[in-house]
Structure formats: C-alpha cells, structure tokens
Amino acid sequence: MQERHTEQDYRALLIADTPIIDVRAPIEFEQGAMPAAINLPLMNNDERAAVGTCYKQQGSDAALALGHKLVAGEIRQQRMDAWRAACLQNPQGILCCARGGQRSHIVQSWLHAAGIDYPLVEGGYKALRQTAIQATIELAQKPIVLIGGCTGSGKTLLVQQQPNGVDLEGLARHRGSAFGRTLQPQLSQASFENLLAAEMLKTDARQNLRLWVLEDESRMIGSNHLPECLRERMTQAAIAVVEDPFEIRLERLNEEYFLRMHHDFTHAYGDEQGWQEYCEYLHHGLSAIKRRLGLQRYNELAARLDAALTTQLTTGSTDGHLAWLVPLLEEYYDPMYRYQLEKKAEKVVFRGEWAEVAEWVKAQ
C-alpha cells in the first residue's frame, strides 16, 4: 500500500486536484480542509471527543479500544460502504487524517481487508497544510500587477481573463464590498488559504509564470483575510487602474447585483422565497454602511431601494435602482476608492479604459 510523503508529492496532489478522502471528524474538517477533499469520517464529533477524553485519562491503548468499540457493527459497515463507494468513484484518490496517524491507517487496513488498496498521505492534513502555507510564501515572491478601479469597473472579469490571473474574490466567495456576499457561504480561513495556495500552484504549473495579476483588494474579503505574505507583497505592487465611463459601470453593476443576483436567488430558492432573499440581500448591504452614510441619508436611500424593488417586482425593470445606486457611488464608494488610491498614487503605472488596461496587462 502506497504512501505519499515528500513536499513535491504534496504539491502534486494539490496541483492535480487529487480527490482526498478525509477521515477526520466533521469539526476538524470544517476548521480547515483541502480543496478536493470529501469528509467521510472514521469517527463523528461525539465519538472523537469520547476517545480523546479516554486517551487523556487512561492512555492510548484504552482510547484505541474505545474507538473500535464505538465504530463497530452496523456503524462500521455503513462507513465502510461509504469509503468503498468513494474509492471506486475516485480511483486516483488518497486517504488523509490529521497527521497520517492511526485513523487513516485503520481505514486503509480495513479497505485492504475488503480487497481495496488505497494510498494515504503520510503526514496527513497537517503536512498538506504546511505545504500550502509554504507554497503561498514562495509564489507570492513573484512580481504582482494589481488591477484597480472604482466599483463596477470590471476588475474581476479582467483578472479572470488573464492566464496568470488569480480571482481572489472568487476564491473567497465574496466580492469585497457591503453587497459582496454570494449564495455560497465563505470557507473557513484555513480552507480559503488552502484553496488559494492550490490555485496559485496550478496557475504557476500551467506556464512559465513571470508575474501575478490580482485585483487590488483590501486585507479582508468578507470574513476571509489575505495571507500576510501575499498582502505584504500586494502593498508594494504596481497598479493598473481601469477608468471606464460612469454609464458603463452602471450597466455592469445592474447586471451583476440586480439581474444576476435576482436570478441566482430565485434559482436557488424558488420565485417567492428567492425574491424575499434578494430583497434582504440588498437591504443588508445598504444597512452595513448605515453609519458611514448617516441616518438621514441612509433612510432616504433605503426608501428609494424599497421603491425600486416594488417597480422591479411589478414590471421586471431594474431601472429604478439607479435612484439609490447613483448617489451611493457618487457620495460613498467613488470618493472612498479615490481616497484610497491617492495614498498609493506612486504605485500607479497605467490608466485607461477596460480594453486598454487588458491590452497593457497582456504586454507585461
């Protein structure tokens, strides 16, 4: 039975999106997991806690005996069936536990007895996690070009279209603003960092990468924060600023935040609940910046939002949203971004409309 235990092995697993059957307890998996991992635990949270308590009080032999007692009979058979199905569905996969210790070896031995030889990660999740951290530190040393611009400038799309681009907001499942949440919940911080490392490794492996193209992000993207090694390099990076006409930005924002989000919510929840979720999403975004807008201005814009939603519901038109979106951009988002950009004006190396910036980036 094979084991994978060198750093190059670990990196290869991440680059190949190798399916990982992670046998840690759900609570461990939720705290941090690799991108291609599926959680099929040897022990559930309660069983793991009981074995851990037994280990502290009575030692390893007693804990092991308790584990075998808890995972026996029908419970063991159900989990064996799940592992067997996962192995057959992912013949190129690999087993993983916390440190490559007893849990993955036990599952591996049970599978072997059932006629399935399946490799494991020697060093477990901890080794993969350290590999991800180290890879990010190393890859972040390459030069970086940041794509800047006011809200609605199409920065994310521009990054996505570059072979050396990494969509930080896509990985974080958040668009970085008060209205930035998506229908997918954000990952834990460790899982986000692991996903970022895997994406950087894959992007680097596909080409002779000379520089990264990233969006000009703040430290936080929703509830996730950028790894310090990458954030530090981004503060030193050159910036190309997209300066598109205001009307084009409004068209993008209408498509992204009104048409697409309404579609996504109704697709996920159905027409009635989807509409309620969509309304709540927009109100929550506006409410998040209430203090910065001031109560009077917030109330005015919230009333315009309500009117726009009524119009959208009755006619299907999203034009009414301009009544609150335009002042929100002119009075809040645009001044805020320009202030932030002024503080790093010496880093700006190019300005132009979207297509001009895209052409400039390709030439770098």
Curated annotation (Swiss-Prot):
Residues 14-137 form the Rhodanese domain. Its EC number is 2.9.1.3. It catalyses: 5-methylaminomethyl-2-thiouridine(34) in tRNA + selenophosphate + (2E)-geranyl diphosphate + H2O + H(+) = 5-methylaminomethyl-2-selenouridine(34) in tRNA + (2E)-thiogeraniol + phosphate + diphosphate; 5-methylaminomethyl-2-thiouridine(34) in tRNA + (2E)-geranyl diphosphate = 5-methylaminomethyl-S-(2E)-geranyl-thiouridine(34) in tRNA + diphosphate; 5-methylaminomethyl-S-(2E)-geranyl-thiouridine(34) in tRNA + selenophosphate + H(+) = 5-methylaminomethyl-2-(Se-phospho)selenouridine(34) in tRNA + (2E)-thiogeraniol; 5-methylaminomethyl-2-(Se-phospho)selenouridine(34) in tRNA + H2O = 5-methylaminomethyl-2-selenouridine(34) in tRNA + phosphate. The active site is at residue 97. Belongs to the SelU family. Involved in the post-transcriptional modification of the uridine at the wobble position (U34) of tRNA(Lys), tRNA(Glu) and tRNA(Gln). Catalyzes the conversion of 2-thiouridine (S2U-RNA) to 2-selenouridine (Se2U-RNA). Acts in a two-step process involving geranylation of 2-thiouridine (S2U) to S-geranyl-2-thiouridine (geS2U) and subsequent selenation of the latter derivative to 2-selenouridine (Se2U) in the tRNA chain. This is tRNA 2-selenouridine synthase. It comes from Escherichia coli O157:H7. The lineage of its organism: Bacteria, Pseudomonadati, Pseudomonadota, Gammaproteobacteria, Enterobacterales.
